[in-house]
Amino acid sequence: LLVRSNHQRIAIKLKLLFVFIQFCPLLNISIVITVKDYSMKNILHIISSPRADQSYSKGLSSAIIDRLSQSNNIHKIVVRDLIKEVPPLADEVSIHEFYKHPGMYDERSNQLLSYANMIVEEVKEADVIVIGTPMYNFGISASLKTWLDQLIRAGITYTFDEQGNRIGQFKNKKVYLAIASGGRKTEGNPDYLAAYLKDVLKTYAGITNVKAYWVEGTVENGFKANYDQVLNDFTSDNES
């Protein structure tokens, strides 16, 4: 049988499937066909501020989630609160496991890397990731840094090609950064936060579609957050 195109192959497979289905009642066979709706989005919400509902970064990240929910078919929203469940600090034993090739993991490895493996799966399943963080001393929160240290791993979030170049494994994801700072950005103030997160996600995970939103001046007298104004140019991942 000569098949000249993919369309012909698909047509033949469908015909064979329909013939098989017709004979299923005679053979007392039942078939369940599951169709995945790829328009449904999974969202991962990372909260890293210790200020709970008083947090402006959490308020901004939640506003982003609301915008996404309005313009997308949401399948699932997973919330990873790094204050309620603090990521474990890397120690000598866990670092040794991090540097193992994934094919060398044993039962003890999986136990020691249980948190790391869990958050890797959360990121892997997410179509969109919303990360909320305050700016502390020009940088990200300690809990977010610890989460990143647990997440990033050779052989898991990135691999190497034959030339030794890193290849990120999570390229088709959209990330929104929701950043809150007590002061305001000026030309003289360095950005060690958004730039750092973008570089880490690009280099060690292959994620290049990263958009940062800032709520600034939160310590000023009479400050009131206007998240709609901050998000006035917001576009969801299926619109950008």
Residue map of PLM features:
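Acidic, Ala/Val/Gly-enriched low-complexity intrinsically disordered segments
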Residues: 3, 11, 19, 32-37
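Hydrophobic/aromatic beta-strand patches that form the interior of the parallel beta-sheet core
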Residues: 44, 78-80, 176-178, 211-213
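Helix-loop-strand module that forms the ligand-binding subsite of alpha/beta enzymes
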Residues: 108-195
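Glycine-rich phosphate/pyrophosphate-binding loop and the adjoining helix
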Residues: 187-240
